[in-house]
């Protein structure tokens, strides 16, 4: 695994999968994940984040042992979102808490974006299907829109 620190972003390469951290690695705004091959199970995000992204690359016939996850109380300070582009292309603008644009990421089929803090906007470039995973429960009132819209 190699890491390259760039202006306001950290790129981590594990095998052929590249992830890019937007914002300071210790307190990121977002992680971008590009497709690639890995062997085994790899978590692409640091263990301290509120939401984890992992990849399981396994051969036919392999089995993950039956298991359960122990219930734990966790304190979360924000709601995280994962966007997975199943088809098409979307452009995601990523903002800090003061609505300053940090990055704009063009996502294509098979790519993911983990949004951890700050704001974001999405523009559909080509007809797309995007799967969104977020922490729940969702009350419907935990969004704050830029420009009051």
List each language-model region with its residue ranges:
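Short, surface-exposed beta-strand-loop junctions and turns on beta-sheet-rich folds
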Residues: 72-73, 98-100, 129, 137-139
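A short, N-terminal "cap"/entry segment at the start of jelly-roll beta-barrel domains
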Residues: 1-57
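Short beta-strand His + acidic residue motifs that chelate non-heme Fe in jelly-roll/DSBH
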Residues: 66, 92-93, 113-115, 119-125, ...
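Glycine- and acidic-residue-biased ligand/ion/polar-headgroup-sensing regions
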Residues: 59-60, 78-95
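Conserved short histidine dyad/triad with adjacent acidic residue
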Residues: 55-77
